[in-house]
Amino acid sequence: GAELNVVSGAALLGLRTGIISKLPDNSLGIYAKNRVRFCGVSDDYLVYDKEEDARLGIYFYENGAYPRKPSVVYDRRHASFCKINETEVPDSMYANTACFHTSGITLALSENTREVAIDMIKKFKAQGALISFDVNFRGNLWTGEEAKECIERILPYVDIFFCSEDTARLTFLKEGNVKEIMKSFTEEYPISIVASTQRIVHSPKVHTFGSVIYLSLIHI
């Protein structure tokens, strides 16, 4: 998912990376594990669900055709990952990590993944790791109000924050220009870096992408 994209990119830059997840102990789980390895990412923190009904969460992406937008259908409820327990991973992981990254998709999947992720964030932070978080809001997984309430619980621990301009306005009810919006997050929370994507939609298949980063000198 989104987190694997991030650690795969970091691995390409020569960093040692790993991913925390729970996979079904079957052929699909083995395939997913091998794809993780293929990306140069360690599978040391993958755990396995040995139940007979264990399943791998999937989603379906449908391309858009003007004027209809692309759409995504998630089929991830009751997936093995939604049953992950932090006692399944070694405690040594927290002290051996320089940066922990997760996203709003993980928080939105289930109440269990939400609470496990929040607890892990606190433990990584207590051991001195940087916390990186991407809102990655998905309206078909949870509402804006649910996302805002949950994410505001973890923002006091976040060092690097990814949030699109649209999400900042619609979910966090921010106002002003992009710089003012990004700066406001660093004023309200001890966030060092805010990164935002900027997208201009020309058609369902043609988008122009840009990005902007706000660096807070207060929290460096």
Label each region the model flagged.
Residues 77, 105, 136-140, 166, ...:
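Active-site beta-loop-alpha junctions enriched in small/polar residues
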Residues 5-16, 38:
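Alpha-helix C-terminal capping segments
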Residues 16-104:
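Conserved N-terminal subdomain of the carbohydrate kinase-like
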Residues 218-220:
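Conserved small/polar residues in nucleotide/adenosyl-binding loops
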Residues 106-115, 143, 171-173:
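Glycine/threonine-rich flexible loop motifs
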Residues 127, 141-215:
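Conserved phosphate/ATP/ADP-binding segment of small-molecule kinases
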Residues 11, 37, 122-126, 155:
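Anion (oxyanion) recognition and catalysis
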Residues 128-132:
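Short beta-strand/loop segments at the ligand-binding rim of alpha/beta enzyme cores
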